[in-house]
Amino acid sequence: METIIEWLIRLDVMVAVVVLILFPLVFLGVALRDATVARRMLVYWRVSSLLAITVYLLSAELAVGYLTGFLALLFIPAAVWMGDAIYHPPDSPLPGASRLRAVYRGWRWVVTGLCAFSIPLIMPALPCVVGGGPNLFCDLWFALPEEYFTFVHGEADPTIWGWIAVGALPVYGLYLAFSAVTWYQRTTS
């Protein structure tokens, strides 16, 4: 059972790197030719920055990373479908028949499916946020960000980067609060 869970988490992370990082990075560059798609991709990057914060929190073994990872999996699909405080797409679906818009619409469904698949994988680690004690899921979710950190930063101290991520949380919180207030104002007016 342990190896199946570990395999699923590794698979989830590998697919997430492709779907949530590599593809959107390339697609943003290509999408600059279509202002509507480019604005929607910028919304995605603002929201998905919580994933970067999560990786650095978990690489420093800061348990709040489980919560930020869970929240990112909720916020990202919401953002690709509804926008954020800075850009709110029209209520109508993404119009037009261009290839870029078709690719964006398809990618949006893939992102939604991936996040729906990922949420049950991280939920068993949520008790670790409040000191539920170490368990298999906590250890597995710490291991992959630590591997990433070592690959990218070598011998650097992950604790320093973890605390930088902690410092980024209030900034992200302000952005999120601004988005929530703006969304509320749009829906009640």
Identify the role of each PLM range.
Residues 1-8, 27-37, 93:
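Short juxtamembrane and helix-loop transition motifs at transmembrane-helix boundaries
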Residues 22-27, 48-57:
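Hydrophobic, membrane-inserted alpha-helices
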Residues 36-45:
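Membrane-interfacial loop-to-transmembrane alpha-helix junctions, especially the N-terminal start
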Residues 106-189:
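C-terminal membrane-adjacent module
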